[in-house]
């Protein structure tokens, strides 16, 4: 499917439908992916000089964009994202769309048994993942509000957040200001319209140059771009001057480790189910999937697990080596597309493998001050 005939729950990252239009928090059109990588601690994160990667034509460099850098702009963004606006992000017509109901699924104080398959249920087991994964809100160039999922990762500046490139800007669009989304606001641990750990505006962001240089709209170009669907953000400190990692903790991040056949956990804030498009999910709670990873039949660079998450889950982490007692693992990929693009079986949530290109973005982000 090349484009969705409607914006499912608005722009809540329609990403799970095609890279070019389903991106974001029910963004516009792309979906979910799972990238697989090797653990990398911030303490060992010296600048990386990767070898040229294959894929789209042209050199793979870092394309950056400035967000809220002044106190005035940061305050404006903070005031823009009211509890009601956050709940409605992704609604096609906010004026007549009812506010989604709260999800009051009770928490479970017991850790989830290791290697327990899950095709999509509210995460109730607490742990670090409930603090450093959250909902990333933004406004599209056409004025609609959308949301994706993002994760705080261990970094030198303690301010680095990873999501999908398509949550930041559309694939194939030129790198000019009006092609980027704006009003970026990350709420770690988002739950039923609340900000348990506060909200963080974004001061700068980056995607691979190979994400924006291909103007083609064919399926093959989407497949090529999928390998570069990672975006890095640098969050502003909170009102107390604390960097986000000091508030939320972080997940490890890894690059280049294949995980075929490994047990992987995926998290996200979907607005609806991939195979159950009703109100199975409403973006109010973090959803969890877990299972043995497998490559996409048509796109081996994409890996995924059985999962019913759809729009809104884009950018969410796929975690290897996940400890269900502590809620800590290693981000090896971020959700980017569904089985339609990858050629897998329904329902499968796919992520792009974090490789040299993502490592380059991460190095750029973690040294930003």
Question: What are the language-model segments listed below?
Answer:
Residues 332, 338-369:
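C-terminal cap/linker of serine protease catalytic domains
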Residues 119-142, 153-154, 178-242:
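Conserved catalytic-core segment of clan PA serine endopeptidases
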């Amino acid at each position: 499917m090349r484009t969705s005939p409607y914006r499912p729950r608005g722009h809540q990252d329609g990403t799970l439908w095609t890279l070019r239009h389903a991106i974001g928090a029910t963004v516009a059109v792309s979906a979910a992916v799972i990238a697989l990588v090797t653990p990398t601690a911030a303490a060992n994160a010296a600048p990386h000089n990767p070898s040229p990667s294959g894929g789209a034509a042209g050199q793979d460099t870092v394309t950056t964009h400035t967000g809220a850098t002044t106190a005035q702009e940061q305050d404006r963004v903070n005031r823009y994202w009211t509890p009601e606006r956050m709940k409605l992000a992704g609604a096609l017509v906010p004026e007549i769309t009812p506010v989604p109901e709260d999800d009051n699924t009770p928490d479970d104080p017991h850790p989830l048994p290791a290697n327990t398959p899950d095709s999509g249920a509210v995460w109730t087991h607490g742990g670090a993942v409930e603090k450093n994964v959250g909902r990333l809100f933004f406004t599209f160039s056409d004025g609609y509000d959308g949301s994706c999922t993002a994760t705080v990762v261990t970094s030198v500046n303690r301010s680095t957040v990873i999501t999908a490139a398509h949550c930041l800007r559309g694939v194939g669009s030129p790198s000019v200001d009006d092609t980027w989304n704006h009003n970026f606001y990350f709420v770690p641990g988002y739950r039923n319209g609340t900000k348990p750990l506060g909200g963080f505006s974004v001061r700068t962001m980056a995607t691979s140059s190979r994400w924006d240089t291909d103007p083609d709209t064919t399926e093959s170009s989407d497949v090529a771009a999928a390998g570069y669907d990672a975006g890095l953000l640098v969050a502003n400190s909170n009102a107390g001057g604390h960097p986000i990692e000091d508030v939320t903790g972080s997940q490890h991040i890894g690059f280049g480790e294949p995980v075929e056949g490994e047990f992987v956990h995926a998290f996200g804030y979907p607005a609806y189910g991939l195979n159950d498009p009703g109100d199975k999910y409403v973006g109010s709670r973090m959803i969890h999937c877990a299972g043995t990873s497998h490559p996409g039949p048509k796109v081996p660079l994409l890996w995924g697990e059985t999962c019913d998450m759809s729009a809104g889950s884009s950018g969410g982490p796929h975690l290897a080596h996940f400890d269900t007692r502590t809620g800590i693992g290693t981000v090896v990929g971020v959700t980017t597309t569904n089985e339609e693009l990858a050629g897998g079986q329904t329902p499968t949530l796919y992520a792009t493998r974090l490789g040299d290109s993502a490592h380059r973005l991460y190095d750029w982000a973690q040294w930003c001050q």
